Amino acid sequence: MNYIDKDIKDFDDYIEFTTFNKFNVKILFTKKHYGSIPEKSREEVAEDFSLKDKIMVSSHQTHSDNVVLVGENPDETYFENTDGILTSNKNVAILTKYADCLPIFIYDEESKIFGAVHSGWKGTYQEIVKRAIEKINPKSLSTINILFGIGISSENYKVGVEFYEQFRNKFPKEIVEKTFSIKDGDFYFNNQLFNYYLLKDYGVKEDKIFLNNRCTFKENFHSFRRDKEFSGRNGAIMFMEV
């Protein structure tokens, strides 16, 4: 497995994932110190990160498996009921929001399509990352690169037996066994690892899937599990440098 913790740069207000820099794709993820993304306008975010020359595209996220592909001349820059945004438009910056759910960043070397999906347990159960890959429709899965952002770690993600049974009844036994653990009679779910094995099962190359050991719950990020109704949202910003 490819863990890329050493490729993550920490700043006061955000972190930067540098793994996709070789594709000229930048990925930023805001910290709690920056504030809550829904309380800021897209114009404010663009100005704060020197992206005023970009078209900032975002959505109302509903834990769906809906993914949109934004074209060269986008008529819409805000999408309802959407949890994945893709584009090959170098003028677009994609803004998605999280508070423990897993950000999954995608880049296809052939089509130059890049994007982000919001995959909490509902998105994972609905296989939103597969919906995104299907939307890209690559000639070969060998050109697909996947980078997991920072979500909640399994040690802080306690779930009920009904949750476990729901996944066990739908997915291959070997994937479920590798991604659920039991401690003192409680179940814990590894969302990142589950998506890793799903992607391998789809046919994405293992050496093009990148993981990390970070955790929103333990670190200076917004976390719904930790802060409950007082939790804000972290923002993931993905764009192509030109």
Report residues per predicted region.
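Active-site microenvironment for binding and transforming phosphate-containing groups
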Residues: 1-242
